[in-house]
Amino acid sequence: MSNRIQTLKEAKRIVVKIGSAVLTTAEGINLGLICRLADQLATLHERGVDIVLVSSGAVAAGRNSIPSGAKLDDLPARQAASAIGQSRLMHEYDETFRRFGLVTSQVLLTRDDLKHRDRFLNARNTLSRLLEWRVIPIINENDTVAVQELEFGDNDTLASLILNVVEADLFINLTSADGVFDKNPDKNPDAKPLACIENIHDLDLDAMCDGKTAVGSGGMFSKMRAANRAAQLGVPTLILAGKDRMIIERIFNGEERGTWIVPDEKSVSRRKYWLAYHCDPAGDLVIDDGAQKALLSGGKSLLPAGIIEVDGKFKAGELVRVVNKEGKSLAVGLSCYNSTDIIKIMGCKSCEIESILGKCPYPEAIHRDNLLLDAAL
């Protein structure tokens, strides 16, 4: 655990994510919790640490102000509740943080904002300037305008992308659970807490995480997936019980609580990280055993010869998933060809592409520079 203590001491830019299940009660926003959160983040801020807060809670905050009998069972209803709740949530954040001498800013994003490289860079520049000004950005999904196919799905996913945007060196995820367990503690009384996870990629997340919170859109699976992504980026994750009193202050004072997830020794480039996670894959490429070995052990590009099946329709330049014959996900990457052309050239040597398509702009189906292995989808 000494590495954990040292990393906490050396952290200069932290992304803190707080979920709806922590932030709200049946009556609405938990004002006492926001006050304690502001107090703890102010202490870190005074030490010179940059803080970025990814906050859920807008829909839950607006729930009590919708008409009696109205249900939040479709996207327009959730968007309307979010529009009500977001302003109330930010008002409470602004008022509370100001009492501790902190200035906050509201940043609302959609997945489309991070999908396009120019808008991604614009978001990065804006957040960088806010942090230079010692302002605390409070980030949430822009639920009111997000369409279903471009939703982040949950703020754990959003937070995992923000780690890359702001170049954070620590990720703290405040949840309703007291860290990570070897299996779902709600269903298994003998579940054991995990104080430290050395290699998150070796875990069977589907078996460990089979439930979600009542008021949130995510669950432990989404939190572990976000931690998996953070590990690839070289960022450690700390999953804590957000309702534990002054929990952030206590762990920075050396108390060992929650679950510490160790990052990969060799991190991926920020560009590859963005390529892999800016949107969902548009299709699958099924590859043979030889291609699988070349990818996993040789760091090679994916050649058409190793592809045995194409699933889905996609354009050249779109993100696709690479799977083996058993359906296991191996990687994601940008396809050099559209799905129609891939079907024509799969199983063929690269030297045969021109005779089949009439042109050969690329000898590979996915170049290794545009390929991320073990993507946490």
UniProtKB/Swiss-Prot annotation:
Coiled-coil regions listed in the entry: none
Any one biological process term the GO annotation gives: L-proline biosynthetic process
Subcellular location: Cytoplasm
UniProt EC number: 2.7.2.11
Protein name: Glutamate 5-kinase
Enzyme class per UniProt: transferase
Its job: Catalyzes the transfer of a phosphate group to glutamate to form L-glutamate 5-phosphate.
Gene name tied to this protein: proB
GO cellular component: cytosol
Family indicated by similarity: Belongs to the glutamate 5-kinase family.
GO MF annotation: an example: RNA binding
PANTHER family membership: GLUTAMATE 5-KINASE, ISOPENTENYL PHOSPHATE KINASE
Disulfide bonding pattern of the chain: none
Organism field: Maridesulfovibrio salexigens (strain ATCC 14822 / DSM 2638 / NCIMB 8403 / VKM B-1763) (Desulfovibrio salexigens)
Keywords recorded for this protein, A-Z: Amino-acid biosynthesis, ATP-binding, Cytoplasm, Kinase, Nucleotide-binding, Proline biosynthesis, Transferase
Domain PUA: 282-360
